[in-house]
């Protein structure tokens, strides 16, 4: 497993834990390209996280990723916009880091977006991102609770299929 950082506070928390444990840690930077969950959303936010990482000698950036909100949707436009946004926000990063954007739906629909790695998500548990595309059967169920709340602007869309639009 790889730790995710999405803001300066997270980077500092990881650094503090590393110092306390006398360890080093590799992290991946989460970019919010349109899912409206965790992640650096603007170039400024991404730069601030990167500056904080540079000041934290025990934390090393080894990857960057985003998550597609609508890769299983009817149209490709929003997914392609997210991919372009991710490419723009990570263009200045080292070519040595792992870049990954492809979730279950995009693994099958957008092979050109596989980059260095893919993340087999819901399909791994038998839930096809689009039922008609893969003959999978569920193998488990999930129960959870809210752990993170994020403020977003009017007009921003949230989650898979962009199911909610902030008013």
Where do the PLM segments sit?
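Catalytic beta/alpha-barrel core
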Residues: 1-11
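Active-site loop/helix belt of alpha/beta enzymes
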Residues: 9-26, 32-156
């Amino acid at each position: 497993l790889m730790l995710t950082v999405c803001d300066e506070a997270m980077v500092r928390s990881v650094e503090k834990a590393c110092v306390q444990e006398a360890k080093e840690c590799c992290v991946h930077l989460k970019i919010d390209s349109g899912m409206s969950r965790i992640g650096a959303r603007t170039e400024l936010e991404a730069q601030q996280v990167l500056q904080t990482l540079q000041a934290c000698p025990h934390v090393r950036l080894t990857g960057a990723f985003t998550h597609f909100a609508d890769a299983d949707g009817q149209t490709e436009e929003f997914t392609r916009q997210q991919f372009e946004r991710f490419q723009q926000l990570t263009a200045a990063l080292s070519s040595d880091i792992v870049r990954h954007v492809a979730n279950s739906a995009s693994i099958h629909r957008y092979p050109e977006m596989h980059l260095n790695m893919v993340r087999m998500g819901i399909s791994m548990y038998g839930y096809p991102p689009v039922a008609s595309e893969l003959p999978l059967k569920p193998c488990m169920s999930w129960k959870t609770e809210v752990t993170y709340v994020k403020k977003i602007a009017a007009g921003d869309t949230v989650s898979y299929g962009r199911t909610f639009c902030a008013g």
